[in-house]
Amino acid sequence: MTDKYENPTSDDYMGVVMGIIMSGGNAKGLAFQAIQQAKDGKFAEAESSLNEASEQLREAHDVQTDLLTRLAQGEKIGWNLYMVHAQDHLMNAITFKDLAVEVVGQERRLQALENK
């Protein structure tokens, strides 16, 4: 039986790749939503969106960690441009979410100062 990570053209492998891409895209969208909510003064909603984004990223990161662990243990992992794209998508989403946390914090501070 072939492992789902060995054949980069298998449906299972592409399912893993698409899962990483979708989780990254969902997380980035939620992080952007959090920024918009913070601009509207909806900080509880913004925090909720950031928490959801973190959960999406955790799911994708778990898959990434599993891949790296298997590779480190000597398992054959097939790589293709789709997987590279998925990893890039995930890292961009992580960075965007981290920046969104900062933007939400700054927006909270700004609105507090404006309301004094």
Curated annotation (Swiss-Prot):
Enzyme active site: 85 (tele-phosphohistidine intermediate)
Keywords: Magnesium, Metal-binding, Phosphoprotein, Phosphotransferase system, Sugar transport, Transferase, Transport
Amino-acid positions noted as binding Mg(2+) in the UniProt annotation, renumbered to this chain: 88
Coiled-coil region: none
Cofactor: Mg(2+)
Induction note: Induced by growth on galactose.
Classification via InterPro entries: PTS_IIA_lac/cel, PTS_IIA_lac/cel_sf
Keyword set includes Membrane: no
Modified residues (Phosphohistidine): 85
Domain spans labelled PTS EIIA type-3: 11-109
GO biological process, one term: phosphoenolpyruvate-dependent sugar phosphotransferase system
UniProt GO MF annotations: metal ion binding; transferase activity
Highest taxon of source: Bacteria
Cofactor note: Binds 1 Mg(2+) ion per trimer.
Role, per record: The phosphoenolpyruvate-dependent sugar phosphotransferase system (sugar PTS), a major carbohydrate active transport system, catalyzes the phosphorylation of incoming sugar substrates concomitantly with their translocation across the cell membrane. Involved in galactose transport with PtcB and Lmg_0963.
Entry text on domains: The PTS EIIA type-3 domain is phosphorylated by phospho-HPr on a histidyl residue. Then, it transfers the phosphoryl group to the PTS EIIB type-3 domain.
Subunit structure and binding partners: Homotrimer.
Protein name: PTS system galactose-specific EIIA component
